[in-house]
């Protein structure tokens, strides 16, 4: 049986961690792309040289997309992971960064449309819901084949902090976060449990609120500790889990940024936009969107997240209208 093929666009710390994790788990052949000369090729060779120890007999190759024709090498990819993008620099506003990364997504989306339009796409570049929308606009790919990282990473942070506080196994904690990052995230505390025991029966509300706050700023905590960069291990692993669920048709239920339309719009208060919600991920991409019932506090938090997504999606719409 032919091996799966996964392309990773962006050879920075997150992209390289995704590639290495997928290689170790022998998920499929891995093709890495980056605009910086030698970076993708170097990361690919570095990962490949670990094969004798870990025993992954895979094709692992890197390509420089300064020559855009090199994108042709992603043809036939089962999954394309998009991590390419700029980091915010001093003096750069959030809107400036958003526009620059939307421009990058436009270029990447057009390349996907040209060379590998049948692939499933996992979008990582922040903010993932808006970048997924930009990839959709640029590529014209069916939206159920596009998934943004969304709440997958926030959820694993939430689960980690709960497990640490309770001194229990990480895998016994079930909890998830929907919506956007930071202030826009919506942790579903009512659905959080340890092997079925509700979190609210195990921790006082004050402690839960502390953990929620830490989760909201989990990325910033890492940035403050690193001082020279942002998180890449946990994001890389979160992405690899999503890719494996597609490639191996595992039907994992994970909160991710998905395209909301039709009946789901009534629940989630958006239409024809991407936002973080619980989805089932399988060989076809987004195979099911789960509608949630909000209580009053959750609904208020959700509306805030929705407004942020609508605002930023409008910026993307305006960009594409001006850059046809």
Swiss-Prot record:
Alphabetical UniProt keywords: NAD, Oxidoreductase, Tricarboxylic acid cycle
GO molecular function: L-lactate dehydrogenase activity; L-malate dehydrogenase (NAD+) activity
Chain sites annotated for binding substrate: 88, 94, 126, 157
Active site: 181 (proton acceptor)
The name this protein goes by in its record: Malate dehydrogenase
UniProt keyword Manganese present: no
Similarity-based family: Belongs to the LDH/MDH superfamily.
Record GO biological process: lactate metabolic process; tricarboxylic acid cycle
Binding site residues for NAD(+): 10-15, 34, 101, 124-126
E.C. no: 1.1.1.37
Keyword Oxidoreductase in record: yes
Catalytic reaction annotation: (S)-malate + NAD(+) = oxaloacetate + NADH + H(+)
Taxon lineage: Archaea, Methanobacteriati, Thermoplasmatota, Thermoplasmata, Thermoplasmatales
Function: Catalyzes the reversible oxidation of malate to oxaloacetate.
NCBIfam families the UniProt entry points to: MalateDH_bact (TIGR01763), PRK06223.1 (NF004863)
